[in-house]
Each structure stands twice: as C-alpha cells, then as structure tokens.
Design a protein with these regions (language model features):
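A general structural signal for well-ordered alpha-helical segments in protein cores
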Residues: 26, 58, 62, 87, ...
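Active-site beta->alpha loop and helix N-cap motifs at the rims of alpha/beta catalytic domains
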Residues: 2-9, 13-144, 154
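Basic, gly/Ser/Thr/Pro-rich low-complexity segments located predominantly at protein N termini
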Residues: 11, 24, 50-53, 85, ...
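Short glycine/serine/threonine-biased micro-segments
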Residues: 4, 8, 43-46, 76-78, ...
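C-terminal alpha-helical cap/extension of soluble enzyme domains
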Residues: 6-14, 32, 36-37, 199-202, ...
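Catalytic alpha/beta core domains of metabolic enzymes, predominantly
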Residues: 127-132, 139-247
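Short, conserved catalytic or adaptor-binding loops enriched in Gly and charged residues
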Residues: 1, 155, 262-265
C-alpha cells in the first residue's frame, strides 16, 4: 500500500471571487507543488477549509487534484466530515476517483467514547478494499475528541487498511507513543519541528506552510535522506522562519492569501502577509 511520507502538503482550497472552487487555480497549485518536489498531497483537510465546503465541492477538489497530479505524487484525500454519512460518501468517492488513499479525522464537536471511536473507523474501513490505505487524523484542539494510543492500536488490529496517523497537536510524548505501534506510519502537523520529528522517527510532516513555501521543507527532507545533519539544521531555520511568517492572523486565511500571492498572482489585501514575499526573496538569494 502507498503511504504518506516526507513533505506532505495540506493544500489550501482556492476560490473564485464568486465563492466557488477555483478549479483552474487548483490545477496550477497542484502543478507548482509537484514541480517543487513535494512528496504527497493532502487536500480537503483543516487547511483546505473542509468545514466550509459542501460534499459536492469536496468531490470536485478531490477529482481535480487527482487528475492534475496524474500519479506524480501520492494523493490522499481527507474525507472526515461532520456527519458519518458524508464521511462515508467521500471515502467511497475518493476510492472510485483514483486516490492513493484517504485520511479521516475523528468525530467532531460531540464527544465520543473510545469504543465509539473504534466502531466509527471500523465502519469507514469496511467501505473500501483492504488494500486501500486509510490514515487516522487526530487534531483534538479542533475536533474535541482525542485519539489515544490504545484506541489507535485497537483500530489498526481490527482494520488492516488503517496504516497510520496524522497527529496535529504538539504533544511529543503522545507522538512517541504512536511511534511504538508496530507497522504504523506517523506524520505530524507540527511543521515547525519537521527536522526534529524526522529524528524522532516520524515518516514526515503534513504541512500547510509547505503549501506556500515547499522549498525549505523539501531541502530538510533531502538532507535527512542523505544523513546530512548540518544541512538539515541549516534548512530547518528557514522552515521555522516561514512557519512563523505564515502564522499572521487566522491560519487558513493567512495561508490562502500567501499561497495565492506566490502561485496564483493574486493578493488578499485584508490579510497581513506582506513579510511572506520578503522572506521568500531572502531564501532564494541564499540558496
């Protein structure tokens, strides 16, 4: 089964001025990210504003990215939604549309027990073939539900196509616990610590910032693959710098504005991201 690894971009969802999904801009963004060396694409997640998209809009995004990527990068569609029925529909659609796999966030807003969490993923797992990979997605600060190590272990034992997790909370002890699960792929959303997380044993990061500035993230991963720790340390400073730069105002509008400025030639004047271009220029001058 294919996996998420390395630099996995949590893609923004571009919109037209009328508020529709901008398919042309999404095509262009997908091409730009692949041309800059990212390993995997992860649309329709938190950064992709999943809660602002209808089921049909999410299907449009999935189909567009899968088609534009054309097998050049692993495409895992995030399919978690507010209702189980919508989640099920999106998982089945992603499989039928040719995705390499899916991610599914925990149930959101209303609390669930560990047993209910396990049953939820068992149902999702049963909708697709056993060889179609599924990643859990734990972001407790947003979902209101936390996925414990013991629950993740139970899910992987019961669901052979659940092969890993995206964890987006900066709890390093919990990260180490996930890494103890046999044959379990762990990726982290704390992209500021990409280099450190690779050293801990994570397979990569799922990063929104890498959707704006993929180059330093790709450089960190390439240095890691070649065991060049000094180069890795140098590049991680740019990763941290860009991550801080993009954390201006609310994270989704900030990333969307920065991304459209850089890749689509548009600028959202209502979002203060002016320093993004300055840092981009300095990085290109030095590398």
């Amino acid at each position: 089964m294919k996996k998420l690894y390395g630099v996995t971009v949590a893609m923004i969802t571009p919109f037209t001025e009328e508020g529709n999904v901008d398919v042309k801009a999404l095509d262009k963004l997908t091409e730009m990210l692949i041309s800059r060396g990212v390993n995997c694409l992860y649309p329709c997640g938190t950064t992709g504003e999943m809660v602002h998209l209808s089921e049909e809009e999410r299907k449009t995004v999935a189909e567009t990215v899968i088609r534009a990527a054309s097998g050049r990068a692993n495409v895992f569609i995030h399919c978690g939604a507010m209702t189980q029925k919508e989640t099920e529909n999106l998982v089945k659609h992603a499989y039928e549309a040719g995705a390499d796999g899916v991610g599914v966030v925990t149930p959101m807003f209303l609390g669930v027990t560990d047993k209910e969490m396990t049953a939820y993923y068992e149902k999702i797992s049963s909708l697709v073939p056993a060889e179609f990979p599924i990643y859990l997605y734990n972001i407790p600060q947003c979902s209101g539900n936390d996925l414990k190590k013991t629950t993740a272990e139970q899910i992987t034992e019961n669901c052979k196509n659940v092969i890993g997790i995206k964890y987006s909370y900066p709890d390093m002890m919990r990260t180490l616990e996930y890494l103890e699960i046999p044959n379990f792929s762990v990726l982290h959303g704390c992209d500021k610590m990409f280099a450190e997380l690779l050293l801990m044993g994570c397979d990569g990061t799922v990063s929104g910032v890498a959707g704006v500035f993929p180059e330093p993230f790709v450089a960190v991963y390439e240095a890691w693959k070649h065991k060049d720790i000094p180069a890795m340390q140098k590049c991680r400073r740019y990763v941290l710098s860009f991550a801080i730069c993009c954390a201006v105002g609310q994270i989704c509008p900030g990333l969307s504005s920065s991304c459209t400025q850089r890749f689509a030639g548009r600028r959202n004047e209502s979002t203060s991201t002016g320093s993004a271009g300055e840092r981009d220029s300095r990085y290109n001058e030095r590398n």
